[in-house]
Amino acid sequence: MNSSLRDIANLVQGMVIGNDAITVSTLSPIDNILPGSLVFAEGEDNIKLAENSEAAAILIGQGTIDSPKPLIQVKNPFKAFIALLNHFYPPRRISPGVHPTAVIGAEVQLGDEVYVGPFVVIESGSIIGNHSVLKSHIHIGHNVVIGDHTTIHPQVTIYDNCRIGSNVTIHASTVIGSDGFGYTFVDGQHLKVPHSGYVVIENNVEIGANTAIDKATLGATVVGEGTKIDNLVQIAHSVKLGKHNIICAFTGIAGSTTTGNNVIFAANVGVSDHVHIEDEVILGARTGVPPHKHLKKGTVYLGNPAKPKDVAIKHELSVNRIPLIRKNIKSLTEQVAVINKKLDIKAKEVE
């Protein structure tokens, strides 16, 4: 797709500095700039790199700049770059229809313009919303509801009674609604706690590949609107996540934990059961949160066990000083031993 800088600027509400008739057909990342492309550059070093490349033009933020290359200036260059990715590389459109190998149960309702791919199983009583896409080898349980414009990728399993919102994306091999890991030790054995609940995924959620979200013991495990979940995440039974959370890979959230809105879990965070996390908390990578803790609004937590950032940094600095402190204590102990020996000698002389 060829587009002039003038047309691109109109698309992203930007301003061209230089020849706006120049056309480009592709975008480039700053670390692999293709000849004749449009490259997004942020920061002085990256802009210089782009200027010295074979790029046709540079997408930059606002500000006064002289450049030998044509520029498109925008208020938010990263947002503009996302819009241009969709413009130059639009997602493949799948024609609606039901593949002949799909198995559709009794009283299943398929909305308008739905695609059901090869070997998909939809059990009885489930509802699939308008314009939704179910790719191959998906299993949809009994009485599941899926909203409009939702895309589910291959090998996903959604258990009975789960509720999936609109504009949701679920990536390959994720499992929604499996039993929670609930057992109690009785009479010398682990007695399984039955799970009769379900999972609610609200609108505009994206869930990565190979993630598991367990159903509640009773009621619902909830993933709030706009939340984005990475690959390889475990969300346990009866967890309730607020709106617009970010959960990075290898994070595990144990049962009955609740979060507010706009909470960020960096990679490999471990949250124990019955934790309450208020709005806008940030948990740094590999943070560990003990059971029944209450994390305060807007606080950044680090370490294991989790501590507010300033406290965690002081603790880490103190730990790093332990070898020096031990060395100093050893030296002082040796000096005290020498002094005691001298005092013992003098005491004997006095006697």
UniProtKB/Swiss-Prot annotation:
Its EC number is 2.3.1.191. GO terms for molecular function: N-acyltransferase activity. Gene3D superfamilies: Hexapeptide repeat proteins (2.160.10.10), MurE/MurF, N-terminal domain (3.40.1390.10). Keywords: Acyltransferase, Lipid A biosynthesis, Lipid biosynthesis, Lipid metabolism, Repeat, Transferase. Coiled coil: none annotated. The keyword Transferase applies. Catalyzes the N-acylation of UDP-3-O-acylglucosamine using 3-hydroxyacyl-ACP as the acyl donor. Is involved in the biosynthesis of lipid A, a phosphorylated glycolipid that anchors the lipopolysaccharide to the outer membrane of the cell. NCBIfam families: lipid_A_lpxD, PRK00892.1. Homotrimer. This is UDP-3-O-acylglucosamine N-acyltransferase 1. The gene is lpxD1.
